[in-house]
Swiss-Prot record:
Function statement: Acts as a chaperone.
InterPro entries, A to Z: ATPase_NBD, Chaperone_DnaK, Heat_shock_70_CS, HSP70_C_sf, HSP70_peptide-bd_sf, Hsp_70_fam
Region ranges (Disordered): 581-607
Family: Belongs to the heat shock protein 70 family.
One Pfam family in the UniProt entry: HSP70
Keywords attached to this entry: ATP-binding, Chaperone, Nucleotide-binding, Phosphoprotein, Stress response
The gene coding this protein: dnaK
Coiled-coil regions listed in the entry: none
Organism encoding this protein: Streptococcus pneumoniae serotype 4 (strain ATCC BAA-334 / TIGR4)
Residues bearing the modification Phosphothreonine: 173
PANTHER family: HEAT SHOCK PROTEIN 70KDA
Record-level Gene Ontology MF annotations: ATP binding; ATP-dependent protein folding chaperone; unfolded protein binding
NCBIfam families xrefs: PRK00290.1, prok_dnaK
Biased composition (Acidic residues): 598-607
Protein known as: Chaperone protein DnaK
Length: 607
């Protein structure tokens, strides 16, 4: 069975891992980095992903960041003169990860386990699955990020029973999950979180502070300058990371803008104490889900054996201190917070292929599911933290006499009134026989699969007529749209491949021309006229093909030049080797002669 890769599709950074033997291994990207920025930019028709895209974010307005925060919404982003759905942008990131995983493995990759925040709702999960499909991946499983982290942490501890709290603060989302580990079973007891809290918010606090201070000093509002704001974002992210290791950092942005007197520079010192003060409310917000998860699991702090930190934002000292204060425990630092989620996803891939045995993952649904009933009330059918997959049915009836149809309004959330919860979808069961209110028996069944994706069925028990939908939110894509996007993605991948091959060829041609010209110059007057003339002719042919911009001709002429240049290089090498041998022979003869000169006659007198 082919490998199933594990992907952590993050807000700020993403990572890909694969199971090798019994160990999960992070695959480095083409730049040698173990995580890849979740950044996509467009330039001259080319799609650029990762480190290269992030580097040009300041100067390229067609750059998209933090797209994960828009997953599951109908919001689109404009770039490259087009509008893209969040699924399409995410697919570009997934395609890039898939591509370099294939280069590493030396084989095609078609299957993946992709992680999502535990608190992602159905629409966000479905959007993630769609993104995988557009990228040419069969998504074998959607796994909650804290659960994946627990898998990576606990795989070698299956003989030990313990309860762990996973504190996952990423770039844009925050989750807390409590799991019970023992005998190879990873049982999620509860999960809680905040999908609007992450490292981006900490960056924004620094940005707001810098904008306010600069305005106070110079009377200019930088928030209206798009390029200045991108520079501020990069500086804020760097300052945040610096302050995890030092107590003070210098922010220096020369020529940030221009005033009446000329260019203006931003120079500011940010201390860790000031950063902690700016972000105090964000750190406080992390405490509520911790308490909620403990309460839902029915556990006290003393029953938690280990606290695992996941996500780059858990490196912030104030966050670490808050976790210590809230749990009363020193966090376990045996896992890399940036890599552990992808590693866990790869392990889940191994469970699916059968390479990892005796491991069972029992995950939960993060939010309650139900329907709207009379009076706009939210009636729950499946409570949050129910182990999935699961199915639950309940019988309802009509609200009016001779009602011919019922509207099923499917919701997800915890609020008592339907209007305050997230609408997942609506559908209608029709042709209900005329009867007084309360008589028809309408059975509503909710099914949640192993990926946390919901389907709902309504059945008239009198006529046995039923209607089923797999929930598709307002932001959902139709099969036709996904197919079109898949074709676009494949076409882009092919175009990108051709473009890369073209660039590689041009680089090879430039290198060959430079090297051959150098060799021809070095061999001047050394008696290789025939070889030099042949190399020069091949060189002229290649230069002509380069001028004509004929790629096929360039490829042919490059091969011809390499052959002629190699012949010339061999002659040069042979001559150099012969000269070396001659020199060594001369030195040897001289040494022998000198040895004879050193012999002198001696006179001895007997006593």
């Amino acid at each position: 069975m082919s490998k199933i890769i594990g992907i952590d599709l993050g807000t700020t950074n993403s990572a890909v891992a694969v199971l090798e033997g019994t160990e999960s291994k992070i695959i480095a990207n083409p730049e040698g980095n173990r995580t890849t920025p979740s950044v996509v930019s467009f330039k001259n028709g080319e799609i650029i992903v990762g480190d290269a895209a992030k580097r040009q974010a300041v100067t390229n307005p067609d750059t998209v960041i933090s797209i994960k925060s828009k997953m599951g919404t109908s919001e689109k982003v404009s770039a490259n003169g087009k509008e893209y759905t969040p699924q399409e942008i995410s697919a570009m990131i997934l395609q890039y990860l898939k591509g370099y995983a294939e280069d590493y493995l030396g084989e095609k990759v078609t299957k993946a386990v992709i992680t999502v925040p535990a608190y992602f709702n159905d629409a966000q999960r479905q959007a993630t699955k769609d993104a995988g499909k557009i990228a040419g991946l069969e998504v074998e499983r959607i796994v909650n990020e804290p659960t994946a982290a627990a898998l990576a942490y606990g795989l070698d501890k299956t003989d030990k029973e313990e309860k762990i709290l996973v504190f996952d603060l990423g770039g844009g989302t925050f989750d807390v999950s409590i799991l019970e580990l023992g005998d190879g079973v990873f049982d999620v007891l509860s999960t809680a979180g905040d999908n609007k809290l992450g490292g981006d918010d900490f960056d924004q606090k620094i940005i707001d502070h810098l904008v306010a201070e600069f305005k106070k000093e110079n009377g200019i509002d930088l928030s209206t300058d798009k390029m200045a704001m991108q520079r501020l974002k990069d500086a804020a992210e760097k300052a945040k990371k610096d302050l995890s290791g030092v107590t003070s950092t210098q922010i220096s942005l020369p020529f940030i803008t221009a005033g009446e007197a000329g260019p203006l520079h931003l120079e500011m010192t940010l201390t860790r104490a000031k950063f902690d003060d700016l972000t105090r409310d964000l750190v406080e917000r992390t405490k509520v889900p911790v308490r909620q998860a403990l309460s839902d699991a029915g556990l006290s702090l003393s029953e938690i054996d280990e606290v695992i930190l996941v996500g780059g934002s858990t490196r912030i000292p104030a966050v670490v201190e808050a976790v210590k204060a809230e749990t009363g425990k020193e966090p376990n630092k045996s896992v890399n917070p940036d890599e552990v989620v992808a590693m866990g996803a790869a392990i889940q891939g191994g469970v699916i292929t059968g390479d990892v045995k005796d491991v069972v993952l029992l995950d939960v649904t993060p939010l309650s599911l139900g329907i709207e009933t009379m009076g706009g009330v939210f009636t729950k059918l499946i409570d949050r933290n129910t182990t999935i997959p699961t199915s639950k049915s309940q019988v309802f009836s009509t609200a009016a006499d001779n009602q011919p149809a019922v509207d099923i309004h499917v919701l997800q959330g915890e609020r008592p009134m339907a209007a305050d919860n997230k609408t997942l979808g609506r559908f209608q069961l029709t042709d209900i026989p005329a009867a007084p209110r309360g008589i028809p028996q309408i059975e509503v069944t909710f099914d949640i699969d192993k990926n946390g994706i919901v389907s709902v069925k309504a059945k008239d028990l009198g006529t046995q007529k039923e209607q089923t939908i797999v929930i598709q939110s307002n932001s959902g894509l139709t099969d036709e749209e996904i197919d079109r996007m898949m074709k676009d993605a494949e076409a882009n991948a092919e175009a990108d491949k051709k473009r890369k091959e073209e660039v590689d060829l041009r680089n090879e041609v430039d290198q060959a021309i430079f090297a051959t010209e150098k060799t021809i110059k070095e061999t001047e007057g050394k008696g290789f006229d025939a070889e030099r003339d042949a190399a020069q002719a091949a060189l002229d042919d290649l230069k002509k093909a380069q001028e004509d911009n004929n790629l096929d001709d360039m490829k042919t002429k490059l091969e011809a030049l390499n052959e002629k240049a190699q012949g010339l290089a061999v002659k040069l090498y042979e001559q150099a080797a012969a000269a070396q041998q001659a020199q060594e022979g001369a030195e040897g003869a001289q040494a022998t002669g000198n040895a004879g000169d050193d012999v002198v006659d001696g006179e001895f007198t007997e006593k």
